[in-house]
UniProtKB/Swiss-Prot annotation:
Residues that bear Phenylalanine amide: F51
Record's protein name: Allatotropins
Keywords recorded for this protein, A-Z: Amidation, Cleavage on pair of basic residues, Neuropeptide, Secreted, Signal
Residues excised as propeptide: 55-135
Cellular compartments annotated: Secreted
Biological classification of the source: Eukaryota, Metazoa, Ecdysozoa, Arthropoda, Hexapoda
Superkingdom of the organism of origin: Eukaryota
One GO term (biological process): neuropeptide signaling pathway
Cellular component aspect of the GO annotation: extracellular region
Signal peptide start-end: 1-22
Functional summary from the UniProt entry: Neuropeptide stimulator of juvenile hormone synthesis.
Tissues where the protein occurs: Allatotropin: Expressed in corpora cardiaca (CC), corpora allata (CA), antennal lobe (AL) and gnathal ganglion (GNG) (protein level). Expression in AL detected in all animals, expression in GNG detected in most animals and expression in CA and CC detected in few animals (at protein level). Allatotropin-PP-1: Expressed in corpora cardiaca (CC), corpora allata (CA), antennal lobe (AL) and gnathal ganglion (GNG) (at protein level). Expression in AL detected in all animals and expression in GNG, CA and CC detected in some animals (at protein level).
């Protein structure tokens, strides 16, 4: 072998040594902060809701409670002509809830006034309507 061939082999060996010494030792370990988990975080979020068979049956719509008292009040004109055989009617409501709804829900307050105070349904409250004696 001539001198140029030895020189090429020596340069190649030196290049391999440089590459090997510059390479990381063993397997790369992460020293940085772990990457956050993507996607859904909990089991409840991993299931579809509101889509067909997976949707929970809504039994609350059948019960009359404080949550749907306003809907029951709005539907009262349609139910006046029907005989009520429904055992789920709401007999009384808490005063604190009623006051809170009157203050925070203008649609509810408007419905209560239309249903129970504005007797002639003219959109105006007369002194007779406001001061009538409810027995």
């Amino acid at each position: 072998m001539n001198f140029s061939m030895h020189l090429v082999l020596a340069v190649a060996a030196a290049a391999c040594l440089c590459v090997v010494t510059a390479a990381p030792e063993g397997r790369l370990t992460r020293t940085k902060q772990q990457r956050p988990t993507r996607g859904f975080k909990n089991v409840e979020m991993m299931t579809a809701r509101g889509f067909g068979k997976r949707d929970r049956p809504h039994t609350r719509a059948e019960l009359y409670g404080l949550d749907n008292f306003w809907e029951m009040l709005e539907a009262a004109p349609e139910r006046e002509g029907q005989e009520s055989t429904d055992e789920k009617t709401l007999e009384s409501i808490p005063l604190d809830w009623f006051v809170n709804e009157m203050l925070n829900n203008p649609d509810f307050a408007r419905s209560v006034v239309r249903k129970f105070i504005d007797l002639n349904q003219d959109g105006m409250l007369s002194s007779e309507e406001l001061l009538r004696n409810v027995a």
